[in-house]
């Protein structure tokens, strides 16, 4: 049955929906953030080089970014709750495989399977809220969802550090199993089903395959570029060709996975370009920072995770309010100021070296980063969702998430290459510190580019497109389709 569009806050029905969506999205967020803190220990236990650690992050991002559009479309057509529950179940089973992995190769393969589950559950969590809540309460509902999601992302590094030092890094993945055992029954009992009655036609499997192939080939070429071989160069060219073919197929397909018409909304296009800049910087920053604190500053996994906790307090206090603020003043200022604050935080991280003092070297940067995230998170998602028809909530969520994950994927693959890291860099404090100091200005520059783009192109949403996909709902205010991951490497 169709989801009732009139669920209000605060009611028991609203609380059950929020509990389900927060639990589901938190599985993906926690997994992304806790993994970064565990990377050094994973490398030691599995005798893995830096490229294997990159793939531990990127295998997940690759399948997530490649299939998240398909996941949103599946939810719109077959039922958002049904696909969400399938995604949570798949994610939990893949997490179990990660936790039992005997080698880095098996772990990477299981991480790729995790990304498939993430692609099914991630767009569904926000789409369920969008389809279930009354328009007057959507801003608060998504703000609450974003706030708890941001808290989960911020707590992730602390939790990951505690798990690594306690029961072991494998529990970083096994933790998802009990979360799924809670989430699935609640969803089946208390969350109404919803779908898009306009969804029809054939699935764009060729588009999905070409998109995945393009991302996989380009990522492989970036990770392996240090070899300087002809095979790597040909792989990169093949990836570009697959990307061009993807664009061609999407323009020709009767039912494309990525409908070109949705980009008829200038606002939607602009905010996704900003997303690419922001999440590329976040992806590189959080991947490298988790290693910098442990390899160079000498922090234990628990101490490195605990260092990120100031962002938790800021997200808890202000995330639920930031969506409403953006609704009043428009998204242009928050989407400009937020990236600039985050860029300043990345430059402040240059103070973190050997024997870094937390109060004077680490904390100031993380406080500024938290302020930037709070400023940016809610308006980003609010603007994305306000730029499309609510019936295409799953598609819009998928596109923005795909942009965020693809940006993080490329950043994690490219930054070690751009900064001169080799496979053993994370085992040497001096070598890693030098690369980190080259990487932070690059990430900051990308954020500044995003801020300039936001100031130049983003406006208060107003209808300007005849396509149903491009209708805007100015009363929808919310956060990034996934809050930024404070331990990862992008959302």
Which residues does each PLM region occupy?
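Small-residue (Gly/Pro/Ala) motifs that create kinks and tight helix-helix packing interfaces
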Residues: 39, 152-164, 218, 290, ...
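Short helix-capping/hinge motifs at transmembrane helix termini and TM-loop junctions
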Residues: 71-72, 101-102, 134, 165, ...
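12-transmembrane solute porter fold
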Residues: 15-37, 50, 125, 231-235, ...
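Transmembrane-helix bundle of Major Facilitator Superfamily
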Residues: 2-189, 318, 322, 329-331, ...
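Helical transmembrane-bundle signal
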Residues: 61, 95, 180-183, 217-220, ...
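Intrinsic disorder in cytosolic terminal tails and internal cytosolic loops
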Residues: 1-13, 197, 457-491
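Hydrophobic transmembrane-helix bundles of small-molecule transporters
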Residues: 165-275, 281, 288, 299, ...
């Amino acid at each position: 049955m169709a989801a009732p569009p009139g669920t209000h806050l605060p009611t028991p029905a609203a609380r059950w929906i929020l509990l389900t969506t927060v639990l589901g999205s938190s599985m993906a967020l926690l997994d992304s953030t806790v993994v970064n803190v565990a990377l050094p220990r994973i490398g030691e236990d599995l005798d893995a080089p830096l490229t294997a650690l990159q793939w531990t992050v990127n295998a997940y991002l690759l399948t997530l970014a490649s299939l998240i559009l398909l996941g949103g479309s599946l939810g719109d057509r077959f039922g958002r709750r049904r696909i969400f529950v399938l995604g949570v179940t798949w994610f939990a089973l893949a997490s179990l495989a990660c936790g039992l992995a005997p080698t880095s190769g098996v772990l990477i393969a299981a991480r790729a399977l995790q990304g498939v589950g993430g692609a099914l559950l991630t767009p569904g969590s926000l789409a369920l809220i969008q389809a279930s809540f009354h328009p007057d309460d959507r801003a608060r509902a998504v703000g609450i969802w974003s706030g708890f999601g941001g808290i989960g992302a911020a707590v992730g590094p602390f939790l990951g550090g505690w798990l690594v030092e306690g029961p072991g890094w494998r529990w970083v993945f096994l933790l998802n199993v009990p979360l799924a055992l809670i989430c699935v029954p609640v969803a089946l009992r208390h969350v109404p089903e919803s779908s898009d009655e306009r969804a029809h036609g054939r699935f764009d499997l060729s588009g999905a395959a070409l998109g995945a192939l393009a991302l996989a080939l380009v990522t492989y070429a970036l990770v392996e570029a240090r070899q300087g071989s002809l095979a790597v160069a040909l792989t990169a060219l093949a990836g570009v060709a697959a990307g061009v073919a993807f664009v061609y197929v999407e323009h020709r397909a009767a039912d494309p996975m990525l409908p070109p018409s949705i980009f008829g909304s200038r606002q939607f296009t602009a905010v996704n370009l900003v997303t690419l800049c922001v999440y590329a910087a976040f992806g590189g920053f959080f991947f490298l920072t988790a290693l910098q604190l442990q390899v160079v500053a000498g922090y234990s996994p628990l101490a490195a995770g605990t260092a990120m906790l100031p962002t938790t307090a800021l997200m808890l206090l202000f995330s639920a309010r930031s969506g409403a603020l953006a609704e009043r003043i428009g998204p242009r200022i928050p989407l400009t100021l937020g990236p600039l604050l985050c860029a300043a935080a990345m430059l402040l991280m240059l103070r973190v070296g050997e024997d870094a003092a937390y109060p004077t070297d680490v904390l100031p940067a993380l406080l500024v980063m938290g302020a930037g995230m709070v400023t940016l998170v809610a308006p980003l998602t609010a603007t994305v969702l306000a730029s499309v028809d609510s019936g295409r909530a799953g598609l819009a969520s998928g596109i923005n998430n795909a942009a965020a994950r693809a940006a993080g994927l490329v950043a994690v693959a490219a930054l070690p290459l751009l900064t001169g890291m080799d496979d053993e860099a994370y085992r040497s404090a001096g070598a890693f510190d030098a690369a980190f100091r080259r990487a932070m200005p690059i990430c900051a520059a990308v954020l500044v580019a995003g801020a300039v783009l936001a100031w130049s192109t983003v406006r208060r949403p107003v209808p300007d497109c005849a396509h149903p996909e491009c209708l805007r709902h100015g009363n929808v205010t919310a956060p990034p389709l996934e809050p930024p991951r404070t331990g990862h490497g992008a959302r």
